[in-house]
Amino acid sequence: MVVLVTRSLLPALFFASRAPFAAATTSARFQRGLATMAAEAFTKHEVIPDVLASNPPSKVVSVKFNSGVEANLGNVLTPTQVKDTPEVKWDAEPGALYTLIKTDPDAPSRKEPTYREWHHWLVVNIPGNDIAKGDTLSEYIGAGPPPKTGLHRYVYLIYKQSGRIEDAEHGRLTNTSGDKRGGWKAADFVAKHKLGAPVFGNLFQAEYDDYVPILNKQLGA
């Protein structure tokens, strides 16, 4: 059977055939834009060099809180808004394992960060982006900047692992104590486990509010 294509249908067929290519091109440009935004934010807010020596994340990780707010590359949130464990999502590769880090390089203040870094969350061996199925080394703790210390940066980093991680030296830290949280370095943990550069990242900023004393009581401070 011979199918005749009229001249009037040719433009429609042409654009239909180009639609997948156009969509792929748009998606690639969007991803490049996000990578540029992440790099600019990590430089602007001096996450490089305060947390990372170089190599900012190439993609943005989604961090959404049940209070209705989300991290957006340095926006200002409140400790009250981020007190509960957020939903963290990224475009994971099938079968891959990931490490999640949340860290504050401004403890107790950005001017005098004598406890840099104070890490708030550490999960390894995450299959895909199913954090609940990963191994939690440090349970989630919300933001607790001391009064009159200004804005603190809370940095999220996602690393792709080359294999499973075991770290008996770090142990398991609960969210009822601040012990062993301060003086920790994301860069040291990354080097120890050969994680390379972060694939995904994000950050927000926060300063003291009325939730902080509640958190301090939870931590026994």
From Swiss-Prot:
<dbReference type="InterPro" id="IPR001858">
    <property type="entry name" value="Phosphatidylethanolamine-bd_CS"/>
</dbReference>
<comment type="similarity">
    <text>Belongs to the phosphatidylethanolamine-binding protein family.</text>
</comment>
<dbReference type="InterPro" id="IPR008914">
    <property type="entry name" value="PEBP"/>
</dbReference>
<dbReference type="InterPro" id="IPR035810">
    <property type="entry name" value="PEBP_euk"/>
</dbReference>
<protein>
    <recommendedName>
        <fullName>Phosphatidylethanolamine-binding protein homolog F40A3.3</fullName>
    </recommendedName>
</protein>
<dbReference type="GO" id="GO:0008289">
    <property type="term" value="F:lipid binding"/>
</dbReference>
<dbReference type="GO" id="GO:0005739">
    <property type="term" value="C:mitochondrion"/>
</dbReference>
<keyword id="KW-0446">Lipid-binding</keyword>
<dbReference type="Pfam" id="PF01161">
    <property type="entry name" value="PBP"/>
</dbReference>
<dbReference type="InterPro" id="IPR036610">
    <property type="entry name" value="PEBP-like_sf"/>
</dbReference>
